[in-house]
Amino acid sequence: MADMGAFREAVIAWAAGGPGDRARELATRLPVRAAVLLEGPSDVAAVGALAASRGRNLAAEGVCVLSMGGAMSVGRFARLLGPSGLGLRLTGLCDEAERGYYARGLERAHAAQFSAAQPSAARSNAAQSNAAQPHAAQPDPAQRRIFVCAVDLEDELIRALGVTRVEELVRAEGDLRALQTFLRQPAQRGRSSQQQLRRFLGTKKGRKIHYARVLAEALDPARMPAPLDGLLTSL
């Protein structure tokens, strides 16, 4: 029986230059109604875990959560999946540094109605400004389908959980000694504990993916970072 994983694999093969017939067939058969464009597999792991914490199964809802292998690929995937391709509703999550790739890629794919949402800090400031101006025009929700992490997804999760809780999770996962060794490196001097933890998560192959899921599962749904909350609410 065809599933969302098969559709995801078909889309990735199509984006790599293969035929698109299989993706088109599965999009209709499943059916698929929306695609979430993410930079990498750690983002997919976190989004899946956070959705599950809210009792949601995105695949069963017809939502394909897709790792593109980097933000520079967003234009290619948007062309295949968006208005000029399969006609799916597009949304996504990106790092602040990659905002431009998303904006340009979506515009070139004739999906200009999708614009980058503000990162957490900017959203907070905007909310305060709007509260002071009750008659100010509010952004159209349809214009806020790309959600931007202030630094990256790991940074959002670490800030939401707090350094102490993340260190407890690292200990529980059996990586405390590796973390202590990492923290003794001269390059880590002068960095905040939050910055050190974020860098630690990317020091070993597979660690970022693993901890994206661990941190997301440990997060209280009520404390979900704004970009992630916005993404899930939009789906």
Where are the predicted features?
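Residues that form generic nucleotide/phosphate-binding pockets
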Residues: 80, 156, 160, 169, ...
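Activity-critical C-terminal alpha-helical subdomain
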Residues: 102, 107-115, 137-193
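N-terminal segment of the mature folded domain
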Residues: 89-101, 106
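Long, intrinsically disordered low-complexity tandem-repeat segments
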Residues: 112-139
